[in-house]
């Protein structure tokens, strides 16, 4: 897919795991209504979770979500979304759950499976999808964080590749869907007046602040296992840093853009303890507390020249 044009990929069903979770409540349901409103969604939308719900309860959850986080229920789009919604209840480790999903998919040949679930469940769900014949012709969208560490990320990658080809795997960061983040590439590379000055000779440092006005209510278990760095820094904020500092890609395809982002990340030396401050690290179970992190990064060889750190970046994340 061309990231700069955001060309859509056609699927004939959308399955999202974690239908009763926080990401679905805050992001997915409002996005689904927006897609219906724009005419971009007219296929079955199947929510999967372990809560003992039915279709009507899923629709009610979608309504509450959109009223709270989506700017209100659209009188035309929401009824159409309601007709598309289906619900499959069951344990992700139970093959019967995925057999029920296979039956609910019906004649769908190109389903898209969106894993809006905790990372430790990714492998289980992918393997169960394969065993139930739900991966044939399918695409799998994996949310961040991708693994808990390097070893688990490699293991997850291996499992995905054992049942899907690379073109069918989408490792996504929903933060990149924010208009300001996505438009940064246009802002930089289309602006012929600005880009010549976007280098270490004109920019001494830049600061990125991610300030959130909500805590971790309802997500204590996830946050205790994940933490600020895995939740928002090594994905959300590093993507923003990459967009800010990457060189113009040779082509506007996803691989060329990815390659330039990788160059930025490789140019950042390992963090030194003196450049990192984390709050609440000594509390045994700060479930009701905000997490906070600030760090100073050095970006070596920015702008194509030699020499040392040309820029610095800081990121703070709270609540997640």
Predicted regions span which residues?
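Secretory/organelle targeting and membrane-embedding segments
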Residues: 1-141, 146-283, 287, 296
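Short amphipathic alpha-helical "recognition" segments used for binding
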Residues: 147, 304-305
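Conserved small/polar residues in nucleotide/adenosyl-binding loops
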Residues: 281-289, 293, 305-320
